[in-house]
Amino acid sequence: EVRTESATQEIHEVEFELKSGSVQSLLAFSFEWVKKYQLWLDVRSKAEFGALLVANKKVSPATMAKETIFNKKESADQNLRGLIANHLQHLLPNIAAISAQVAEDEHVQQAQLALHHLHLSLSLLGDWTDQKVDKWAHQLSAFESHFKNLQHFEHMQRTLGALLQNPKTAESLDKDILYAK
C-alpha cells in the first residue's frame, strides 16, 4: 500500500530478485508464476506509484527514446545487446501504462515506436549475434501490427463516435442522396 495524507493506493506485488544464477533462469521461473497465477510483470516501482499519488496523477509521462551510442571497443554482440536494452527501456514503461489501462495517446505512440525500433534492430542487425533472433523478430512484427490496428481502432472510435453521436449527422444522412430512404 502507498499512501499520502489524503489518498491511498493498494499495491499487490510479488518481487523476484536474482541473488545467484542466470537471468534466463529467473525469467523462466517468473514466467511460470505469470502463467500459473495470472500475474503480469510491471516495471513501475512503489516509489513511482507514491510520486503519482502525491501529484494526484494516474500515470507517469510517456517514456521517450534515448540515443544509443555504440562502443567500438565492444563486440558487435555487446553493442546489439545494448541497443536492445535501450529499446526495452523505451518500450516497457509505456507497455506498463497500457496494460494498467491508464495510458495516454503518447504511451501508445511511444510503445509503437519502440516496437518498430526493436523489430528493425533485430531484423537488420540480428547477424551481429549468435543468438537466435528470427523468432523474436517474427513475434515483434505481429505485436507491432497489433499496435497499428489498436491505434487505427482508437482513432475510428474518436472520430466516428463523435460523428455518429452528433444529431446533425443523422439529419445530413437523411438528406444525402446515397443514404436517402
Regions found by a protein language model. Give the residues of each.
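Function-determining surface determinants
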Residues: E1-K181
